[in-house]
Amino acid sequence: MRVTQTVFAVFHHFELAHQLQRRGHLAKIYSTWPWARLKREGLPKEFVETFATLHTATTLLGRTGRLPVSADTFLNKWNTLTFDNWTARRIAPCDALISISGSGLKTGRKVQREGGKFICDRGSTHQRYQEQIVAAEHKRWNVPPPYEKPHIVVREEAIYEQADAISVPSTVAARSFIAMGIPAEKLHVIPYGVRLDKFKPTAVPDPSRFDVLFAGAIGLRKGVPYLLEAFARVKHPNKHLTFVGAVQDDLRSVLPRLPQQHVTFTGTLSQPELAARMSASHVMVLPSIEEGLALVQGQAMACGCPVIATPATGSEDLFTHDVEGFIVPERDIDALATRMQQIAGDPALRQRLSEACLRRVKSLGGWDRYGDLWDDLLHTLTGLPRDPVEPDYIL
């Protein structure tokens, strides 16, 4: 079987590429980032092709803080369309194309004309559903609505219609597609894995402190205001809340209204630095109102750090409530505060949750279960027989 991938930047697609390569399925992965960045993903260069100039330039300009939203929107739209045109010209015949959502429409049609299958890989909820949730949250906090990008919804929905299948990382994401009219039989839930070689326990949380961690984009979509309000209610003489990640523009006008005592913002950290923070934290809290399946949950669990999360994070596909952590309703400040207080006041509970986390991620086999589920889906869609000999990675 020959499988090709298209992806903006990296996301989880290089983990998938490794799984496909080990099974002998990977033909090529096309990315909009340069090889200088992609080589750290550890995939042989012969499998990687890049269309990097436009995306790299847009990213660098964006980091200056001087790129107007309208210009950023135009450049990203241009990048999306030209990347799709480029991959459509370059792609060799294959049995299946896996494209991160937003990419691959023209390329997918070409693959289908040549007898292959086109799979849209969506990392979060349905685009229209997502935009409705985020717009409502902006209104709730008196923040101007997000810059309208109707072309994104139009393109995404055209891709959903064209694709032979849509993969999502969680049941909650699949439900959003069904709510927006996509047939359930077109959807396939394939939860993400975790790199156990990079995320593992390296420290023990300080028993004299209560360290709470948040990791990810620090904005309204991630439910950050609810975490700050809840943390302020936690009673502990030496409590600390650390935010790892970049503060989003939509939160900047809201932050001054929120309690921030004993709160630290570190900015973005490297994966080794993040793993160290996770190992040293008593709990990670992710109160998102919309997501797909937050990778940081599995990463924290692999470090022995219990998780408090909302269903919107995809938590229900990753861990069990009151076993490896706690699942609380979205926007529920009382529930967040109660569960944090529980862990702060009961070291034995925290230890039980931590040990359960390590058992759970070990059972997932890193990214291997993810690869197995993709292997099953690809064989089902293409109808191609499995190799009679098991691949070497199982030996």
Question: How should these model regions be labeled?
Answer:
Residues 321-322, 326-333, 342-347:
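Conserved acidic donor-binding segment of nucleotide-sugar-dependent glycosyltransferases
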Residues 203-233, 242-244:
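Conserved donor-binding/catalytic core segment of Leloir-type glycosyltransferases
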Residues 172, 193:
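Carbohydrate-associated surface elements
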Residues 289:
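Aromatic "clamp/platform" in nucleotide-sugar-dependent glycosyltransferases that forms part
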Residues 160, 268, 276-281:
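Short alpha-helical donor nucleotide-sugar binding micro-motif in glycosyltransferases
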Residues 252-272:
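Nucleotide-activated donor-binding/catalytic signature segment of Leloir-type glycosyltransferases, i.e.
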Residues 41, 58-74, 114-154:
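Acceptor-binding helix/loop patch of EC 2.4 sugar-transfer enzymes
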Residues 306-309:
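Short hydrophobic beta-strand element within catalytic cores of glycosyltransferases
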